[in-house]
């Protein structure tokens, strides 16, 4: 690919998305978190086989919280206590949750090796208290500990989507219009749900042109 000919050029959805699958492929190389969403940067493969620069913003992530019931309590008791409080605090109409058995192998005392927790999916993007996290030491009448309250969006992405470092991703249902021109990349895409981003087994690694910038401070001898 002649990369110089692609600089400054914006590619359209029709040039990128496979008409048979409705998806496109991206080799992600870097990321950043912005306004409780995840921005992925990397190389996107066009329908003609070109590799172009791309930015994909992924919304809709949920933080996975695990509430440990007190002795003599069960997940249903925790649900009855905590769900209404979370809905009020974060301005949510509903919250998904379910009992889930988990193992624990770290240093905190009084944590069972294996037991049933209440798993709660708390959206990162909420109408209220969106930057307020749940502290691990939070306790209630029915629970004595909370895991996952400080998990960041990138950690949620790699764990929930099973992404093992830079790799090829198959991305569906991308919006190519809403973010057009938001970055200096050739393609800017918005994806509303992380479930539309799936890692795939493709060992071909795209070429990458890099530039290194060294910044040095120098004292002004005149001042």
Regions found by a protein language model. Give the residues of each.
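The two-metal-ion catalytic cores of nucleic-acid processing enzymes
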Residues: 1-223
């Amino acid at each position: 690919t002649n990369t110089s000919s692609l600089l400054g050029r914006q590619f359209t959805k029709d040039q990128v998305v496979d008409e048979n699958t409705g998806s496109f492929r991206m080799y992600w190389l870097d990321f950043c978190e912005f306004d409780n969403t995840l921005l992925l940067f990397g190389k996107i493969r066009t329908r003609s086989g070109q590799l172009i620069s791309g930015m994909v913003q992924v919304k809709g992530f949920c933080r996975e919280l695990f509430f440990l019931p007190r002795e003599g309590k069960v997940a249903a008791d925790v649900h009855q206590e905590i769900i209404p409080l979370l809905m009020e605090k974060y301005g949510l109409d509903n919250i998904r949750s379910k009992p889930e058995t988990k193992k624990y192998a770290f240093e905190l005392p009084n944590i069972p090796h294996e037991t049933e927790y209440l798993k709660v999916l708390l959206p990162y993007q909420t109408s209220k208290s969106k930057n307020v996290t749940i502290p691990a030491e939070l306790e209630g009448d029915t629970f004595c500990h909370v895991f996952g309250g400080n998990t960041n969006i990138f950690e949620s992405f790699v764990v929930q989507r099973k992404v093992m470092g830079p790799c090829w991703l198959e991305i569906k249902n991308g919006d190519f219009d809403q973010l057009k021109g938001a970055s200096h990349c050739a393609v800017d895409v918005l994806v509303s749900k992380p479930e539309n981003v799936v890692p795939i087994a493709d060992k071909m690694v795209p070429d990458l042109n890099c530039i290194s910038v060294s910044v040095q401070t120098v004292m002004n001898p005149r001042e």
